[in-house]
Regions:
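N-terminus-centered regions that define maturation/targeting leaders and the start
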Residues: 2-169
Length: 169
């Protein structure tokens, strides 16, 4: 099944937004290691009718240095988010996640959100929302690559919200 990739500018069907920052704009420090390190509020709309679940991956493709990126750092992995869910509230705890939502392991080797904390320069943070044609089995806290492998062939649409952050000093 082919996946349609959308960006904020295209006036797409599936949309992910945050009331805390605009697409390609700065992420407020409260959502970073320099602040409270809590997850930003996220909202989505126009989920395809055939979707059975949603997945969210937040990562930084500019690690460790945007001038010479060597890896993508994973900040948050969620899957089996119910399609009826309109989004995630600011600073959401694991217990408050929508019923059925499962967490994966980020690159700090733990579940949950880990905010931006770039060592060098201004980094991009990609909030990628996937509409899936299935509800995935319990993957036992997968890393991003394991989740992506399980999603193959089941992605109906994808939306992306990009935020940026650079530490001061």
């Amino acid at each position: 099944m082919a996946c349609k990739k959308h960006t904020q500018e295209e006036g797409m069907a599936i949309i992910i937004t945050s009331s805390a920052f605009f697409h390609n704009e700065n992420i407020p420090s409260v959502y970073t290691c320099d602040g409270r390190d809590i997850s930003p509020p996220l909202a989505w709309q126009n989920i395809p009718p055939a979707a059975k679940s949603l997945a969210l991956i937040v990562d930084d493709p500019d690690a460790p240095d945007p001038a010479a990126p060597k890896m993508t750092w994973v900040h948050w992995v969620l899957y089996n988010i119910p399609v009826e869910s309109p989004g995630l509230e600011e600073g959401i705890s694991p217990a408050a996640l929508p019923d059925g939502t499962m967490e994966g392991i980020n690159d700090w080797r733990r579940t949950g959100y880990g905010g931006p904390c770039p060592p060098i320069g201004r980094h991009r943070y990609l909030f990628k929302l996937y509409a899936l044609g299935i509800v995935l089995p319990d993957l036992q806290e997968p890393i991003k690559a394991e989740l992506e492998k399980s999603m193959q062939g089941h992605i109906l649409e994808k939306a992306e919200l990009i935020g940026t952050y650079q530490r001061s000093g």
